[in-house]
Every structure is written in C-alpha cells, then in structure tokens.
Amino acid sequence: MKAIISLLLISAMVFSMIEAVPVEEGLQLFEGERGCLPHNRFCNALSGPRCCSGLRCKELSIWDSRCLG
C-alpha cells in the first residue's frame, strides 16, 4: 500500500514539473526540432507539410524546398 501511494505522489510531482514548461517555449522547441528555417524562408523537407511561419512547404526539387503562401 505504501508503494502505491509513493508511486502516485511521484507521478503527481513529475506531472507538475512537466506542466511548468510554458506552452510557447514548448512550441519553439518543437519548431526547432522540425528543422524550420524561418529567417531565409526555406523549410526542411523532413519538417512536415508546414513551415514555422504557417506557410506551406513546397518541394521545388528533391533537394530544394521553400516556404510558400
């Protein structure tokens, strides 16, 4: 019984620490992991169908993709 209570308390502590990260910071980390490059309006083909700025990623060739409206 003590083990179950300890496990529940530890789970609650971990969840509260995860929730402490701001949503905006989490989104910035996610966009960085996708390989988005908003400064030159290029997008990584592996980043998915959307660019960081909300524009669509258009594949111009196998090696070149750009963020287009």
From Swiss-Prot:
Transmembrane feature ranges: none
For this UniProt record, give its keywords in alphabetical order, as a comma-separated list: Amidation, Disulfide bond, Knottin, Neurotoxin, Secreted, Signal, Toxin
In the record, which residues are listed under signal peptide? 1-20
Q: List the disulfide bonds.
A: C36-C52, C43-C57, C51-C67
- Pfam name, any one: Toxin_7
**Gene Ontology MF: a single term:** toxin activity
Q: What does this protein do?
A: Insect active toxin causing rapid but reversible paralysis in crickets. No activity shown in mammals. Does not show effect on mammalian voltage-gated calcium channels.
So what family is this one in?
Answer: Belongs to the neurotoxin 01 (U2-agtx) family.
Q: What is known of its domains?
A: The presence of a 'disulfide through disulfide knot' structurally defines this protein as a knottin.
Q: What is this protein called?
A: U2-agatoxin-Ao1g
